[in-house]
Amino acid sequence: MHLRPWNIDTDYDTLVKWWDQHDFGRVPKEVLPREGMVVEDENNNRICAGGLYMNINEHKFGFMEWVVADPKAKPKLAHKSIKLLIDSLIKLATDKGCVLLYTVTENPGLHKRYVKYHGLSQGENNARTFVKDLTNGKYGPMLWAKSQEVLDEEQDN
């Protein structure tokens, strides 16, 4: 198992495949961060990936996002790979000069993992996220930014 920087041009199709398999929705390529990591097995098969938004020239705040794993990966391999990925994203943020790292997820597995294995503190329990398409609809319904609960509520209204 090894780690490498992600390349949005060559890794994007894999991310889309995993997001589709997780029924997550597709994050537009142009909004993904330039910084990110991919964990691969010994045969260079991708296992998991995640991104890190940061602009150290303007602030020392990092935002870790889009952590996703191949849903077909064996659970033990996925667990070890995700640990390596998150530890590496935290190290990257530290090495680049970030002093605070923030992340948001609705995934209960990541909730536990962030606290137990990576030393993150839980911030909020019932926060809501909001997103606005500033292109007047180019990104459609933005399913990638909505939880199933929100999608169900929208369908009921």
Task: Locate predicted features.
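Short secondary-structure junctions
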Residues: 3-4, 25-27, 119-125
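Short loop segments at secondary-structure junctions
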Residues: 42-44, 72, 133-137
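Short acidic DE-rich linear segments
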Residues: 155-157
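Short N-terminal secondary-structure initiator segments
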Residues: 1-19, 136-145
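A conserved beta-strand-loop-helix scaffold within acyl/acetyltransferase catalytic domains
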Residues: 5-7, 13-42, 47-69
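Acyl-donor binding region in acyl/amide transferases
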Residues: 62-118, 124-125
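Active-site/acyl-donor-binding loops of N-acyltransferases
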Residues: 103-151
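Hydrophobic beta-strand residues in large extracellular and virion-surface proteins
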Residues: 3, 37-39, 101, 130
